[in-house]
Structures are given as structure tokens and as C-alpha cells.
Design a protein with these regions (language model features):
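N-terminal secretory signal peptides
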Residues: 1-16
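N-terminal export leaders
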Residues: 16-32
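Aromatic-Pro/Gly-enriched surface loop or interdomain linker
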Residues: 37-104
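Catalytic beta-strand/loop cores that center a nucleophilic Ser/Cys/Thr
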Residues: 42, 84, 160-239
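Short alpha-beta junction capping motif
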Residues: 50, 101-149, 234
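Short, solvent-exposed loop/turn segments at secondary-structure junctions
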Residues: 54-55, 93, 115, 145-146, ...
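Short catalytic/ligand-binding loop motif for oxyanion handling, primarily in non-cytosolic enzymes
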Residues: 57-58, 94-96, 117-118, 140, ...
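Extracellular ligand-binding/catalytic regions of CAZymes and related secreted enzymes
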Residues: 89, 217-224, 232-270
């Protein structure tokens, strides 16, 4: 898979950080691959990046994510050393996360939007068990606050107070610089973001490493939480607010670094 294809077509002109470039070089040296459907290699940890498969088909998003959001997220995880990165979609066999694959997964990243109700209850229950009883990490992105696995883990409605896509911009603020998810991350701006307004109906998080300030088109500002963490049973859960399908958030170096850090943080600890 040609990483430059994504950088040239979709990334903002900020360039990759030195850390990311070094990580990508290490990937090339070690031969770690982005695999659409294999079992984990011995001695490697596994992260599965799941999406429902609509972003590459819908008008307004297919130009941004022509190979879908899961591929963009997975490309951004390549600097992770010792990880096998697998993409999966709702339309794959077993909805992308069969029992054998799930049992070998250390962290599951989830992006859903329109097809939350199509995810089978049995899969939701298996994911819930893997997190609560066996310590698998779970990362929910943007509209996945309504994903059935995330709602099952939270045990609440998981709704935001408002949803507005009106040209709002956002400043992402590192609130807890010593949190592992914030390692190497500096405050940054997103020129456009779908505004998710408080309150967010979830359990009180144990940490909010990333905060934010929304700036509306009229100049008014509103605070909003951008990254929230929980421990659910034996597992760790992270929710990341940005990631609307018509914006190129998942090609931004800052977002990719956050997600790399989140995978390491959420992974089961020996």
C-alpha cells in the first residue's frame, strides 16, 4: 500500500513530524504490513481498525476517504513498533470481527456513523466481554459515541447535547500533558469540525487528556471535551471527538500521533 498516495491527496500541508517519519522508516525496515485479514503474527500485538464502510461511498466523504476511514486510520498507526495492523469492515465475513480474530486482538478501534443498528448483538456482547473480562482496549471515534459496543461498555445513552456542522473550527488543547495519550502532542487547530455540544451523557471519565474550544462562524466560543478515558472492568476505553467523515482529520499528523499513543495506552498490560 502506497503511503504517499494518502499524504499527497488528502493530508494538509503541515508535513509529517520527524517522529512519524522515523516510525514509518522503522516500519519499512521491519516489514510490518497493513493486512486486511490475517491472524496476528507470533510475538506481535494486534490492533484492528473497524469501520462500517460508508465513508468511501457517500457523496462528500468518498473524495476525502476513497479507501474508507479505517484505511486512513490504519495508515496513521504504522509508526507503532511491534504491532500488526488489520483493517475490517461491517460487510466483511463475521462483520469484520469473528471470534478467532477478536480473541487475538489487543485493541479494537471503531468508526461508525449510519449503520450502528446493523451490528449484530452477538458481536456487541463478545466485544463487551473481551474488554470487561479479558482486558482488550477499545477506542471509539467521533460518531461512534452511538456505536452499540461503546454504548454497551458505557451503560448510558452516550448522546451529546447538540450536533452542528456549520463551519465551526476547534482548538484542541492538551489538558493533561503527562497523560500517555498526550505524549509528544501539542495544542493544534482543526479548521472545520462537526460540533458536539455538551452535555455528553457518559459516565464520569477517569481522565480527560484532551479538551477543546469550538469557535462558531459568528465568533462565539464553546468548550468541549475532545478525548476521554475510562477503565471498564479489566479494559481501557478511549473516546476521541474529532473525525467527521467529510474532514481529513485522520490524515493530520497530530491526530495520528494521538491515536498511536491511545493504542499503546489502551493495550492490555502484562
Amino acid at each position: 500500500m502506497n503511503t504517499n498516495e494518502y499524504q499527497n491527496r488528502n493530508q494538509p500541508n503541515t508535513g509529517l513530524s520527524r517522529r512519524t517519519m522515523l516510525g514509518l522508516s522503522a516500519v519499512a525496515a521491519t516489514g510490518m504490513l497493513l493486512v486486511p485479514g490475517a491472524l496476528a503474527s507470533p510475538g506481535m500485538r494486534r490492533v484492528v481498525v473497524w469501520s462500517e464502510g460508508t465513508a468511501s461511498k457517500d457523496e462528500g466523504s468518498k473524495e476525502v476517504y476513497p479507501q474508507d476511514i479505517n484505511t486512513a486510520v490504519a495508515e496513521g498507526l504504522k509508526p507503532l513498533a511491534g504491532w500488526e495492523i488489520i483493517t475490517a469492515t461491517l460487510d466483511d465475513p463475521d462483520q469484520g470481527v469473528g471470534e478467532e480474530r477478536l480473541q487475538g486482538t489487543d485493541v479494537l478501534i471503531w468508526w461508525g456513523h449510519k449503520r450502528h443498528g446493523d451490528v449484530k448483538r452477538e458481536l456487541v456482547d463478545r466485544i463487551n466481554k473481551r474488554v470487561r473480562e479479558e482486558g482488550m482496549g477499545f477506542i471509539a471515534l467521533h460518531s461512534s459515541h452511538f456505536a452499540e459496543p461503546f454504548k454497551k461498555l458505557m451503560g448510558t445513552q452516550c448522546s451529546w447535547g447538540e450536533y452542528v456542522a456549520d463551519g465551526t473550527s476547534a482548538q484542541i488543547i492538551v489538558k493533561e500533558p503527562n497523560h500517555p495519550i498526550c505524549k509528544g502532542v501539542k495544542d493544534f487547530s482543526l479548521p472545520k469540525i462537526e460540533r458536539y455540544g455538551e452535555p455528553f451523557k457518559v459516565p464520569t471519565p477517569e481522565a480527560v487528556p484532551l479538551d477543546g474550544i469550538y469557535t462558531k462562524p459568528n465568533g462565539d466560543t464553546k468548550p468541549g471535551r475532545m478525548g476521554l478515558c475510562w477503565t471498564v472492568g479489566k479494559g481501557r476505553v478511549f473516546y476521541f471527538t474529532p473525525g467527521h467523515e467529510t474532514y481529513n482529520d485522520f490524515f493530520r499528523p497530530e491526530v495520528r500521533l494521538i491515536l498511536c499513543n491511545a493504542v499503546e495506552w489502551a493495550a492490555p498490560k502484562a
